[in-house]
Amino acid sequence: MSEELPIKFTDAAADRVKQLIDEEENPELKLRVYVTGGGCSGFQYGFTFDEKANPGDLEIVKNGVMLVVDPMSLQYLVDGEVDYTEGLEGARFFVTNPHATTTCGCGSSFTI
């Protein structure tokens, strides 16, 4: 029986993280997803690389790479999906959040 994770980490996102980590030649890097106040809708998503997971962080391993989320951000990301896309608007990581009642045009800020 598999344990249901509170956030989905897509293959596309994990594969891109792996490529970026390989380019940096630092296998300790993890993708950290976080939520901060700001943006045009009240909250905004952030993505950064971190060499460590902090106590209490959610850790999701996929395709040999780790996604980490702090407990405060996790409450805003439950049932969401971290994905990666490349298109006419450029390449970016993004979050699909079913609990967001409003999102801005670029998709990086939201309201719950």
UniProtKB/Swiss-Prot annotation:
GO molecular function, one term: iron ion binding
Record-level GO BP terms: iron-sulfur cluster assembly
Cofactor: iron-sulfur cluster
Cofactor note: Binds 1 iron-sulfur cluster per subunit.
A GO CC annotation given for this chain: cytosol
Protein residues bound to iron-sulfur cluster: C40, C104, C106
Record carries keyword NADP: no
Keywords, ordered alphabetically: Iron, Iron-sulfur, Metal-binding
Known role: Required for insertion of 4Fe-4S clusters for at least IspG.
NCBIfam families linked to this entry: iron-sulfur cluster assembly accessory protein, PRK13623.1
Assembly notes: Homodimer.
Family: Belongs to the HesB/IscA family.
Name the record gives this protein: Iron-sulfur cluster insertion protein ErpA
Naturally occurring in which organism (per UniProt): Pseudoalteromonas translucida (strain TAC 125)
